[in-house]
Amino acid sequence: MKIALKILKWIAGALLGLIIVIGLCWWLIPDEELNPDARKFTDIASVPPAAKNAYFMIWGFVASPELDPHVVGQQIVAAHDRILAAEKDLSRFKVDAFYGEHKLTMPKDSKRFCDAEKENCLLVYHAKRAQMLEQAEEKKLYLARYRKIREYEDFSGAMSQTTFQTPVPAWLPILHMSDLVDGEIADRMKTKSTQQAALEELDAEVSSWRRLLQGDDWLITQMISVATLGRKYRLASEIMDAYPEVVAAHPALMTKITAPLSPAATNVITSMGAEARFTIGTFASMDTNRRFLADSFYEDLPGLPLRAAFAAGAFRPNASTNDGYLIFKEAIDLFAKSPKQVLEGRAALVARQEKLSRLTLGAVFYNPVGRITNATHPSDFTQYAFRIDDIIGFSRLLELKRRIIEGNIALDKVAAVLANSGAELMDLYTEKPMQWDAATKRISFAIQGKRFPVFGYVTLDHFK
């Protein structure tokens, strides 16, 4: 019995010693050298925002009526950047403190007036005319602020640096004003004498959201711009169906509204680069982010010192930065190619990115926090590039529709028009003419972003 106990004690001691040795080895393994290319990529200096940056108005949009929203936005950005410059925690930074006592708030259950994915918004806006006009009157000050945004030329992001704690502007009220403006456009289109004013408003809307799409390098803002531009384009398509005569009556305006977006007019490579620097930068600040990651992944460990100490072995910032750089670099390199080439290279890119973020035994032992965090990135970054390509394709469909109406093209001639359209109006993903279905009177292409199916077609409903 005593011999058995001695053996058990010996085994237990040996196991404990082995665990201690493994733990020390794990804790003492040095971090790898930082890839010079990753360092160069993340060290790109930010450009201070111009004084007339639209983002100041966007940040201050919901401020109390007595406050200047542009000034409020400047105060928010300056306070945010001061905190970051001092390397302080942003968790206590509250933008609400700048908005005053009577800031604009939206009900949490607020819904859009129209579901552009399922409804004809022109008809919905007509049906909800009284409700929308009433809200427009109630919020006329904020509608004026919304229209003021269109006067800006600089739409680049105002923050000098962003982190995982940087707040997002209050977009919901801005999008609500966008809907109210669309309702006013729809209402004015019903009367011939106000149609020009309606189209001028729509042109201003399209131009403003195009500039935001091109100027900003924040991926979330680009996706908001894509969705909103899609609603504007869908409304333009519905207007051409209901009032095809406006194409001939207002040719210059309609040509501006339907002018196709070009890849150069978007910002996907820059925004993906900014997204990469933001994500990789999460690993750059040792004290703040090691503490954050320790809390996130090991919150059950008692006491912050123990969690931070555990993270010292579980998290290696250079290795994490190097892995993150490789994940993003391949995506950015692919996005520099044509949409057709991106589509063809999509599967290979996803496979390589999944391999880089795979939780192998060696990776988990060496850098579990970094590898787990990198594994949380989307494995398919192409979905964001394709959403932008989809809106470009949608703008091409809209321009084709305008030309068909302008040329009074018969239904049996549409296929020939599509076949003879130039490269600037082709399907981006096949580099061939758009598809035509005479039975449904629909011109289309196969979208790849998957988020907005209605971007993939226009219907020639002006044919009665």
Give the residues covered by each predicted segment.
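Short acidic linear motifs
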Residues: 2-464
